[in-house]
Amino acid sequence: MKLENLNIIIADDHPLFRNALRQALSLSFANTTWFEADSGDALQQVLDKPTVGFDLVLLDLQMPGSHGYSTLIHLRTHYPELPVVVISAHEDINTISRAIHYGGSGFIPKSASMDTLKDALTAVLFGDIWLPNGTEIIPIEDDATDQMASKLSDLTPQQYKVLQMFAEGLLNKQIAYDLGVSEATIKAHATAIFRKLGVRNRTQAVIALQQLEMDKLDLT
């Protein structure tokens, strides 16, 4: 595999960071096309491009709409061949271990040098798992969170998008307008979401989603 002519997504809500990352990596990965997303919803819109085959996602766990590890879980379920590298300002062993536990192909601290970043992405693009030097992954034993992660993975991309919009506090009518579908369609999605998550209403569904957020896992 030649590391050129790649399609790489940078999903982070800080435009200065995205720009710096893109400029630095462009020197190492020739003729790469860079796609950017500043939220979980924007990331899904990029992934929905039917004519683009993506090679890598660089994912910030805390951008708006990401809900911690839930977007990572969603990506691993619906895009299993697409490597996802987590880039985070949180560098503690619990954060790193959960990122790998939920399917990340690597973890890069935002404090890493550009040389380290280049080496990490090269390793992942060649099929390896990359971790900071000296990192020893700890086992994650959290049955309740793992069960919710499994339930979230059952949601279709559209259902996951609707659940994210529930978390933003949008009404069914607003969601229907934004997605260009009928309100009845949103109600049908809601019913399916509640069933798959084992909850009874929107509030419980949002609480379920929040179980995968970093601060709910005492990782801040």
Residue map of PLM features:
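Acidic catalytic/metal-coordinating carboxylates
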Residues: 39, 67-70
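Active-site beta3 strand of CheY-like receiver
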Residues: 52-58
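Active-site residues of response regulator receiver
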Residues: 60-61, 88
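The feature encodes the CheY-like receiver
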Residues: 64
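Short amphipathic alpha-helix used as the core "switch/output" element in two-component signaling
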Residues: 69-81
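Short, flexible helix-to-coil linker/hinge segments that flank and couple to helix-turn-helix
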Residues: 97-100, 109-152, 161, 214
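Recognition helix of helix-turn-helix DNA-binding domains
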Residues: 169-204
